[in-house]
Amino acid sequence: MEERARSRLLRSKATLEQDIKASYLMDHMISDGVLTNDEEAKVLSKATRKEQAVALLETLLRKDNRAYISFYNALIRESYGDLASLLHSDLPLLSPEGEKSFADGVSPSVQAILSVGGVPQRPVVFVSRPPLLNLIREMLYQLRDTPGWVTVFGMAGSGKSVMAAEVVRDRSLIKECFPDGVHWLSVGQCERADLLVRMQSLCFRLEQCQSSDTSQRPPSTVEEAKERLRFLMLRRFPRSLLILDDVWDSSSLRSFDIQCRVLLTTRNRALTDSVSGVRYEVPVENGLDEEKALEILALYVNGKMHKLPEQARSIVSECKGSPLVVSLIGALLREFPDRWSYYLRQLQQKQFKRIRKSSSYDYEALDQAMDASLQVLEAEHQELYRDLSVMQKDIKVPAKVLSVLWGLELEEVEDVLQEFVNKSLLFRDCNQRPYRYYLHDLQLDFLAEQNRDQIAELHKKMVRQYQRFYSKRPPDSADKDSLYWYQFIPYHMAKAGLSKELYSLMFSLDWVKEKARIMGSAHLINDYVEYGEILDKENSEVRVQFQEFLSLNGHHLEQRPFPDVVQLALSQPDRSEVYRQALMQAQKRASRGQIYLNWVNKNIEEGLSRLVMHPHQGAVYYACFSKDGSKIASCGASKALRVFKSTSGEKLLELQAHEEDVLCCAFSPDDRHIATCASDRKVKLWNVERGVLIREFEVEHEEQINHCQFTNTGRRVLLATCSNDKFTNTRLWNPNKKTSQNTMFGHMEPVNHCCFSPNDLYLATSSSDGSLKLFEVSSANEWKSIDVDSFFPESDEEIKAMVKCSTWSADGSQIICAARNTVFVFDVETSDLLLKLKTSRLSTIQFCHACPNSSLLAVALSHYTVELWNFESSKKKAECSGHLSWVHCVQFSPDGSLLLSSSDDQTIRLWETDRVHTSSAVALKRDTDVLSSHSDATIIAPDSSNRLQVLSGSTGAVVLESEELSSRIRCSCISRNAAFVALGSEDGTVQVIEVPSSKASVKLSGHTKTVHHCQFTDDCEILITSSEDSTIRVWKWRTGECMVLQGHMEPVRKFHLLSSSSSPHLFSWSFDGTVKVWDLTRGQMLQDLVCHEGAVLSCDVSSDGRLFATTSANRTAKVWSSASWKMLFLLEGHKDCVRSCRFSWDNKRLATGDDNGEIRLWSMLDGALLKICPRDTKDSMNSYHAGWVTDLHFSPDNRVLVSTAGYIKWWSVESGEALQTFYTMGGNLKKIHVSPDFSTFITVDSIGILYILKRLEGEGT
């Protein structure tokens, strides 16, 4: 019976006893089914009318709401209207609608049942957890027709008891499954005597609910109490639910194995293994989500969630949403609302004793609650559990690691861990095989605090056990269970204070190689940053050397197949410890026949980027720093958003953000959110910490969205976007609303970029209509407009000079924008042009950004470089080379110390602003020639200043440098006696220069277009040149006499000179698809062969002169007979243009290379395909060789093949496997010069760096 009705009966009891005649009323109540004949007989057995009335009312008080209503109706029918009126105001509601109408969702009838059963009321502050409640209810419905057990288990303070009480506040559940009531018993940790008292109390409560007047004595033993309960449940309460709260051990639980329906809460999920009957389990998650936890704190302090201080989120994060901790701190804050920072500090400092009881929880302080779980373990297991103090937060550990730590068999360890899991002392991730184990943050903090004085020793134990177990060989990198050691053994060494062991490990190239193979470079770099202070005490220079090696080669270490780390390390400066270790290892391996190359002329410049990252598969369109500079976000053609540490490149977040290319991303002023915009016309807002979508704004732009940016300060946060729309192309958004707040009108063409002024008062927009506009943010009105196109007088009226981007000076007084190859600096107030900076005429500016605390301006260019300018002095301060394709974006860090650049080459480079400078070394062009001798080589190459340089082949030192030429040098060659150098120019002229005087000997005119190739004959008397004008010229260069070989219809890019006993012949090939053979003495065409339908891209002649091969843009290669001039083999299979070919020295094989980076080896016996190099492994650029295969050379013994494309590779001719790879700084190698003994390799890359590579010989060779 509900409380109000029972109270009314008790208050009216005296009046009713005086007036009613029980015998008249009982007939009606028996008819209604609320009174039995036995109960009527007991009442009538009383001697007097009043005694009968007293007995009837006593019986009625033990009944439910239906009995109250039946009694009320009987009073009406027997004309006791005045008495009925006493009861009328508290009549219970029995209709379903009435049951649901109460504010807290719990009807009085349900509340009455729960009160009788001793179920605790809701806590003062309560937040529902519907998914968990539904799961428990679902399990309880399984007990509707049969007895059984439902176990709700979880760690201390996870909210088990609150959920168990809440789940039965459900009328439907009680009516359908437990109509005979719900009974609650708190068990806890108790001895047998205490357990008997609790069971006696339950027996008494159940007996009170019966109508029997006989009072039984309490049971005197646990066994008797168990039998009494069994009888009561089976006979009197067959469909009731017994809730056992906080059960600790199986012996206590067995005392309630009485074939009834039981819901129990416990920290030990395995308890029900000791009882009979069906069993169901419901795990309770360790923590609430952030929103629920904040809701609890808000309720405690009577505030709104969005008005809670920032410390509230930190408290929730620190305790991982533990319901117990949140409630304890919330209750304390109710008394002391200004102590947010204090309680956060106590949590961070693990001062659990100060977070003391202020709720109905059983323990005085948080540490007591956690210690209680630990005390039930055996002493031996307590020691093992203590060792877990060395675990890191959020790190899941395999059992094999703990097997090493404890020195136990794996099966024994798994048994111990199972016990810890069962007691909610440890958690198991079953989604991984083998299982991974982890501690809740609070448990770990508690352990760390409890064992504070022994932490170093515990870490030392971890290290010593690791060293003992892996003394003979390191952990197997292929074994997933061993990955823990690679990730965390430096951490344990540092925490143990084992500095020497840490130096030895981290200053080892073997360790670097193995860890990089498994985890990539970012983890390693992070280790050098994390433990830098310890390592620097040993040798700060060596620490920097290892860190720089990883930073500059990190993108290579992401490649699969994994590169040879020893070869990468050989490119480090000779003074570097990394180089010293690599050289020792390389010499040992070279003794066994392996190929290693030493870069003898390396000069690692200070201006190189300090960190190279490869975050995306595809172009990186945009990257930006967080406001605190600790993180970098990037996006691009991969459609993904990625966030990583700016110190190491370690990935923090990666998610698929859009369905099309993501063009821009931006951090919010507080760094908690990131906005993204894309080609799919969508703008999205993401939570950085959790990686979840917060909001997808309405699609209001009609075309792709090019850029997005938040305001710089958090006073009034707005997001600006701009797009390719014709009119409504710039919008302002409130991050809390799905629709835009304002639209800025003015541009009639796409807007490429937008940015807020430093004080957020203005928004600058850069448009394809040739203008730069400034809008007032508050009104969205146009404030100023600058016609940038008007500063290009040569501009076509119909094609405007597109303004690509803009940026504000640090003080906001100047606005800087870029169009074509020019940077303009304007005064904001007057719109006057203050300065104009012109970059290379051959490039266009893709992006620019002004340093936030200086007058430096970074400019991203289409010709793969980044330039730094001082926009006050108009001077170029530095040029940053290294990217292999267009640079899309540049941005300074908030403090101006770093500069990032993102590129089409899929990388992001990080530069130190004060270390980059304009290189003193002149960049060479790739149009080189090399003359090899037994002891040395001579290299000639034009440079970026259009001078010819002659360099030493052993050191790369400049021997000679010509005057600057007026027309761009496009080819060069050196005579066999090294006395003369020839140059072919873009204007068609040819010059011969004497060496070493650099005196211009002769200038030859005749070609009308670019000269592509030149070569001296062996006697140095004849110079042959080929040109874009389709002709070949044979010069007696000393006299200027010339013979013209005409016949080709398209440019002649190259030719091949053949010497024979009779007369010299010349092979030439052209884009017209033909190969022609010429007699050089008479200038006569001997053969004119139509070889391919497409352009002929390369040709080679076998060493015996019997065969020649041609390759074409039509994806085929052909082999021809020099005797019959007929085709012998058609070689098909390449999937792209076949750009290079080379016969082996024994003429048994032909190698061909294509624009997809693939190399094929063919038999010259029958034209059969022998090998494909590589077979199926593409690199990070989705190519087999990072670009076109431009050159091929066989070793003299025909066992090795070297190739050039994006880098240099050496291949086994027999197996087709790669033997070695040398990664150049730049890419797009044009050719490689190989010494006759195959020991020296010389090339120049796309950024003008010369490589003289000498093959290392083995030790003692």
Curated annotation (Swiss-Prot):
WD repeats lie at residues 615-654, 657-696, 700-743, 746-785, 798-836, 840-879, 882-921, 964-1003, 1006-1045, 1047-1088, 1091-1130, 1133-1172, 1184-1223. It comes from the Eukaryota. Gene3D superfamilies: 1.25.40.370, Death Domain, Fas, Helical domain of apoptotic protease-activating factors, P-loop containing nucleotide triphosphate hydrolases, Winged helix-like DNA-binding domain superfamily/Winged helix DNA-binding domain, YVTN repeat-like/Quinoprotein amine dehydrogenase. GO terms for cellular component: apoptosome. It is found in: Cytoplasm. It holds the Pfam family NB-ARC. GO terms for molecular function: ADP binding; ATP binding. CDD domains: WD40. Residues 106-417 form the NB-ARC domain. Residues 1-90 form the CARD domain. The keyword DNA damage does not apply. The keyword Cytoplasm applies. SUPFAM superfamilies: DEATH domain, P-loop containing nucleoside triphosphate hydrolases, WD40 repeat-like. Keywords: Apoptosis, ATP-binding, Cytoplasm, Nucleotide-binding, Repeat, WD repeat. GO terms for biological process: apoptotic signaling pathway; regulation of apoptotic process. Signal peptide: none annotated. ATP binds at G154, M155, A156, G157, S158, G159, K160, S161. Monomer. Oligomerizes upon binding of cytochrome c and dATP. Oligomeric Apaf-1 mediates the cytochrome c-dependent autocatalytic activation of pro-caspase-9 (Apaf-3), leading to the activation of caspase-3 and apoptosis. This activation requires ATP. This is Apoptotic protease-activating factor 1. The lineage of its organism: Eukaryota, Metazoa, Chordata, Craniata, Vertebrata. The gene is apaf1.
